From Swiss-Prot:
It comes from Bat coronavirus 279/2005 (BtCoV). Its main location: virion. This is Protein 3. Residues 56-78, 126-274 are cytoplasmic. Bat coronavirus 279/2005 is highly similar to SARS-CoV (SARS-like).
Amino acid sequence: MDLFMSIFTLGAITRQPAKVENASPASTVHATATIPLQASLPFGWLVVGVALLAVFQSASKVIALHKRWQLALYKGIQFVCNLLLLFVTIYSHLLLLAAGMEAQFLYIYALIYILQIVSFCRFIMRCWLCWKCRSKNPLLYDANYFVCWHTNCFDYCIPYNSITDTIVLTSGDGTTQPKLKEDYQIGGYSEDWHSGVKDYVVIHGYFTEIYYQLESTQLSTDTGAENATFFIYSKLVKDVDHVQIHTIDGSSGVVNPAMDPIYDEPTTTTSVPL
């Protein structure tokens, strides 16, 4: 308890003018230098503040977040909490160092610093994934993989949990009312309609890039689901430069990443001859 109270009441480090003692004119080598430290801010209240932020951060995970601004707000709070945790760690480390109690907590601080480095590296990797996907979604969602396709109008990036042999993309049919609330859905994630789908999609991960080719479509009348069209993609084992595709007119060609989407809008009449 005494050790806890001594840490809880530590203050901020304020450097005072230093002085040199025991220095005689005849001896310029042997001297004692002292740098007084003054506590001016209670360290304990800062710990309480960070603890409250951590509780708020954990409580926010219980609330379902669906809108992008809610996800952005949550990630912003999480980022601020991580910065405050890093500040408190360095701040308390300096205080314990000044109080001569660093040795008792050296291993704990080493572990905290390692975790902070891992968190920072993860943030850098998510930024790199954003660059690969041309989207901010990797910073908003915690998924390991993202299904991406790019059109002239929009860069689609939908979170995906694992690598599978088949990807099923659910879309509103564009003709029947009422339409689906979200136009493109994969699993529990969705993306609003901005442009059409393409012959292929790509799964991006930290060290993963897997291409999937459109194999078939299933309409609402085939599945019994209302107002929905299902685009089924299968994993490719061929080289990317020699991927054969099937277009609306039945001709085959080579996948061109810059090509226009073959579906301007998913409709009940959309089909792909195989």
